[in-house]
């Protein structure tokens, strides 16, 4: 028996499976004394202790609502019969850290978040958790922590930002999101947009609190939280400023106490079938390629075997239905207007494309939740009908071939044609490609190869939104293929292949590409090949040494020593 002795009755789970060691008996007197100082009374020591963890900060709009939502979650915990204990963790804003050295720290923050939540929960022997997050890496970081700890846990998303509205100097008006600013930078640099219009877009893109508005990484991961069963049904889509989120916060607090009473933990919910549901929903929405990386990492924490092959296997059966930015016309608030994530889940379930028997944080199955909500049908515009999809298969494809023996990830929704063959233009890290584009040295038909940006070689597997936005802004979005051992933003558009594995620093084929080589990708065949004679390629390996480490101390140096391949989720350990 562990040191945290449980006292459950024969048929009833203990609602304090861990905290008794700090609340019960004479040896807990020092801990009880500290608890009294933070407001606990005699009656509270019999209640389960619930951690309310959030990545709240004032650096970015993504997280601004989280302190308010944490208060709501605490109210719900009290109402449910528990005692809430609020604590915080970090968050990195990709929108601010994009395109410079700061982006090295983005994916690293996912691990720091998971580790920090685990550290507090384990050190203080807290019984369960409500985990709140708003930015791209904080969502998977929280879900990784939940899976690793395997306690009663509910995840709650901060919510999406409302779209901005801009009137340009030619009199045209349109909705805009953060991604429009990155593309406007490229257009302005190429002389295709005035500085005045760039300024107008800058001032319009973020009208208030919330995460980036399209089906980018944060909204994709919020949909995944709901599809996995780790978030309350219907909680992913309402915008951050909508006070329905406060009610979801209160209900999340009540729900975690109910999970303790039922004896349900995170791994009871995050099963292989649940991950298959999450992949299916991601494919149907046309979600971010970052979902591949994050789902692999979350599954590993849940001790569920998930591989890149699962994404193609499921994607083959799931049509792409969401006409959502970055490739489509609509944003997350539009999804909310037509009923939210339950709409697409109900359609997939009715078509036999989801597992309805998966348990969720309500204590009920996915099918039971959807029957209770009874969401409307797909609207046919924002979310297309199953028999009239945007693409017949999912929006993300895993490629293999001589260019990526361990795999690469492509948002196939961005390709108008299945086949692209072009000439390599090779750059060591992102800045070289940006400089070449600014100087007019990237042309139609080029394959821009950016290497030494992988999990270990970067380190941190930076997102390439600055260069992809600039390529699109320069009018080359459909004519230039970009491939990298780094990542792409959920807002990236164009012809982009990322997560190329093995990465350059590990001696993957990407390390040996030279200017002028021909590279061919065939989306339908899922092939991705370097068209160089094998003997020539082997000769290039003679005497090869990777670029020296860019960081030799601090968190990035530690990360580079611990991180694994993107093909397995870029997990540490």
Swiss-Prot record:
Keyword Membrane attributed: no
Q: Which UniProt keywords apply?
A: 2Fe-2S, Amino-acid biosynthesis, Branched-chain amino acid biosynthesis, Iron, Iron-sulfur, Lyase, Magnesium, Metal-binding
Q: Which PROSITE patterns match?
A: ILVD_EDD_1, ILVD_EDD_2
**Any one GO MF annotation of this record:** dihydroxy-acid dehydratase activity
- Top-rank taxon: Bacteria
What does the record give as EC number? 4.2.1.9
Top EC group: lyase
Q: Which residues hold [2Fe-2S] cluster? A: 62, 135, 212
The biological processes this protein is annotated with in GO are: isoleucine biosynthetic process; L-valine biosynthetic process
What Pfam families is this protein classified in?
Answer: ILV_EDD_C, ILVD_EDD_N
Under InterPro entries, the record lists:
DHAD_IlvD/Edd, Dihydro-acid_dehy_C, DihydroxyA_deHydtase, DiOHA_6PGluconate_deHydtase_CS, ILV_EDD_C, ILV_EDD_N, IlvD/EDD_N
The role this protein plays is: Functions in the biosynthesis of branched-chain amino acids. Catalyzes the dehydration of (2R,3R)-2,3-dihydroxy-3-methylpentanoate (2,3-dihydroxy-3-methylvalerate) into 2-oxo-3-methylpentanoate (2-oxo-3-methylvalerate) and of (2R)-2,3-dihydroxy-3-methylbutanoate (2,3-dihydroxyisovalerate) into 2-oxo-3-methylbutanoate (2-oxoisovalerate), the penultimate precursor to L-isoleucine and L-valine, respectively.
Q: Self-association or partners: how does it assemble?
A: Homodimer.
- Family membership, please give it: Belongs to the IlvD/Edd family.
Q: What is this protein called?
A: Dihydroxy-acid dehydratase
